[in-house]
Amino acid sequence: MSIFSIVTAPDERLKQKSKPVLECTDQTRKFMHDMLETMYNADGAGLAAVQVGILLRILVIDIKEYDPVERPKDFYPLFIVNPEIIEKSTELVTANEGCISLPKQRIEVTRPESVKIRYLDYHGKSQELKANDWLARVIQHEYDHLEGKLMVDYLSNLKRDVVLRKLKKLKNNIV
């Protein structure tokens, strides 16, 4: 297993739209496992491939410790390839979010309370999943990454600029 470096804002790759995966191969599955290890290493709940510099429509999610919904034992981790949101609730919920590509930042984001997605699973089989609560939020957050959208994009221009300046300063002090 490999642990990848995390791409952090204001890196321009995070603003690009990811491309579909053509086929779920052994190489794709190894990459997803490496993404998962990287996510665990960064104490994340989810990770999009773009966050490790690969512009493919792949997500990994594991929130079993925080999910209020009782799920089958083998439900997590979720490997989600080429997701599309096919349904969103009209009920909106605002909650505080963090992101491993935006270190030390917490932002209030309003999102639909539930979503239904269609995707390919770990084996390349088509699946549908209706998610609500925290899982819906994590799916939407990670899906935004595939679309080149960050949680700071939900802020006003002024607030977004302040956060991005902080991140740039943080990045320059670290590198």
Swiss-Prot record:
InterPro entries: Peptide_deformylase (IPR023635), Peptide_deformylase_sf (IPR036821)
Entry-linked SUPFAM superfamilies: Peptide deformylase
Required co-factors: Fe(2+)
Domain of life: Bacteria
Molecular-function GO terms, alphabetical: metal ion binding; peptide deformylase activity
Tagged with keyword Transmembrane helix: no
EC number(s) on file: 3.5.1.88
Cofactor annotation comment: Binds 1 Fe(2+) ion.
UniProt-annotated binding residues for Fe cation: C99, H141, H145
Keywords per UniProt: Hydrolase, Iron, Metal-binding, Protein biosynthesis
Active site per UniProt: E142
Gene Ontology BP terms: translation
Reaction it catalyzes: N-terminal N-formyl-L-methionyl-[peptide] + H2O = N-terminal L-methionyl-[peptide] + formate
UniProt cross-references to Pfam families, sorted A to Z: Pep_deformylase (PF01327)
Protein family (similarity comment): Belongs to the polypeptide deformylase family.
Function, as annotated: Removes the formyl group from the N-terminal Met of newly synthesized proteins. Requires at least a dipeptide for an efficient rate of reaction. N-terminal L-methionine is a prerequisite for activity but the enzyme has broad specificity at other positions.
Protein's UniProt name: Peptide deformylase
Gene this protein is translated from: def
